[in-house]
């Protein structure tokens, strides 16, 4: 096509950029040999195409121009060969406070993590390094970083909290066995596990001594608010107080349409009239007809707080509820 006059420099070397990003090394070579300008390329456009990057480096592409992107993207994507090539050609392993190591840890690329650390990456550049790996459930990376001296207690034991929140039981167990403080921030790890419905983690932490009553029954309140019935049952069966904060659990379960949780709490003595029948008022204004019907059938006062259960849903357009309550 070039031999018949096709212009290859159109739109800022678009043909070259497209061939590079698609990994077509033969096309890249052909275009460059016919005058295409390498200087328009950014290596991070082609971060996973090793042969293209090799060719670009060998032909004068400046990898330092794009340090902020290229090595970071290669590490983030787990492209070990590319990471190796970039570092051997002078890319800065410490770019952006060791961001390549951060992203490799966060995305679960163990071999890249090992390579970066063995080549001088600083595991202490980010206090949250173990946190990132724990949040992602990357147990082998967590173990490797801890073995290399990373602090599992960084940011007030944030690693354990995020592993609990994200549902990674094996990571939670490992961190606790290594001395992570599951009582940090008034049992925040337990609360997060309850909020997200990770029953096995909840059980494990409670068995290890986490306090289900911390912060005025926050664990039960969060589990109820989020609708995790099995977690709610477990907590109540282990002594959690369903009346904490004026039956907060019942109120928030009503607000968020968790009928099964509402039923369970009431079967276990929750006060339907707490805070001037707040459960009914919340269910009503938020348009939860089945919940409203259930609460009324079980004695909720539709006239509480100056008929709020009747008036507020009207303003929200919940005509079915208004008609039912009238």
Swiss-Prot record:
> What are the protein's UniProt keywords?
ANK repeat, Repeat
Database matches in PROSITE patterns:
ANK_REP_REGION, ANK_REPEAT
InterPro entries (alphabetical):
Ankyrin_rpt, Ankyrin_rpt-contain_sf
According to the record, where are the ANK repeats?
A: 11-40, 42-65, 66-95, 96-125, 127-154, 155-184, 185-214, 216-244, 246-274, 275-304
Organism's domain of life? Answer: Viruses
Q: Name one Pfam family in it.
A: Ank_2
Name the UniProt record assigns to this protein: Putative ankyrin repeat protein L25
Q: Which organism is it from?
A: Acanthamoeba polyphaga mimivirus
